[in-house]
Amino acid sequence: MRDIISPLIFGPPWLEKNRENFLKQDTVYEPMNKNSGIYNLLSHMGQADWNLPYEKLVCPVLVVTGPHDRIFYDKEVIEELSARIPKVQKVEISDAAHMLPAECGPEFSDVLLDFAKSLKP
């Protein structure tokens, strides 16, 4: 699974650092456990209802994106949804994709800390 999905959800810097760990000759591919969380996520994510009343959110919301996410990143959709959230802050991490904590942990942590500091008690 990781050999197929990783290039779609990780950014170039992470892929370059981890390239030697993928597509190895001795890799054994086994079916996913149907009781696992990742199996449930992958098999049901297409049925999720994302049509939520974002306009009614009263708390501050942080939207952190990585433009190299080849599955979920759609700039138009991000702009449309962000425009519907009253108290939104957006941050795009330019070298990242979907797996922000794994790809750029320190930078992602700084974004979260800055957001937390911006909140009024």
Regions found by a protein language model. Give the residues of each.
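Short alpha-helix in the alpha/beta-hydrolase fold that links the catalytic acid
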Residues: 59, 73-82
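Residue-level signal for the nucleotide or nucleotide-sugar donor/cofactor binding architecture
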Residues: 33, 72, 76, 103
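Active-site acidic short loop of glycosyltransferases
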Residues: 58-59, 87
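Short beta-strand/loop motif that positions the catalytic acidic residue
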Residues: 57, 63-65
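Catalytic active-site module of serine/aspartate enzymes centered on a nucleophile-bearing elbow/loop
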Residues: 87-121
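Alpha-helical elements of Rossmann-like donor-binding domains used by nucleotide-donor carbohydrate transfer enzymes
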Residues: 4, 24, 40-44, 76, ...
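Conserved alpha/beta-hydrolase catalytic His-Asp/Glu region
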Residues: 1-55
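Acidic catalytic loop of the alpha/beta-hydrolase fold
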Residues: 68-72, 98
